């Protein structure tokens, strides 16, 4: 953009370079959050971390306990990352009677959290500083039972479209 010699250029604030990176893992059902974990960089997700910090929360949750009392198998869905599909994680889930809902191999964009919820959370969190975990919990509390049911239905519809398109990108 060209400006006259006697005018000062408009300034724009720079993004903070030192903003810490983190990985947010959220498992939820129609009744709300079941497990949440925030992994700070430089740490990385591996099978043991997933079991100790995320899946253990799920196994100890009220939702999991309800499924056991109703003699139903608890179902979980996640993408096809190596950590999720590792023998260690799969064995842990089998030992705890957890069913894994399969995810199409090349369809990472159908995960309900990634596709439907994280975009909303990201917009709401923009420019915000402070306790991310409490912020995420507060935001999930604002999603109604009907909102979460709609997300599940949209996910089912999207999965059906992936199946109908023989796995092609939709």
Question: Model-predicted segments: where are they?
Answer:
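Cytochrome P450 catalytic-domain "roof"
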Residues: 58-73
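Extended, low-complexity cationic-aromatic segments
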Residues: 1-57, 61, 166
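Mobile genetic element proteins and their domesticated derivatives, centered on retroelements
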Residues: 26, 54, 76-79, 93, ...
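Intrinsically disordered, low-complexity regulatory regions enriched in Ser/Pro/Gly/Thr
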Residues: 16-21, 27, 67-70, 92-95, ...
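C-terminal anion-handling pockets and recognition modules
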Residues: 113-170
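C-terminal catalytic core of Y-nucleophile DNA break-rejoin enzymes
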Residues: 48, 81-84
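RNase H-like polynucleotidyl transferase catalytic core
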Residues: 12, 77-80, 94-112
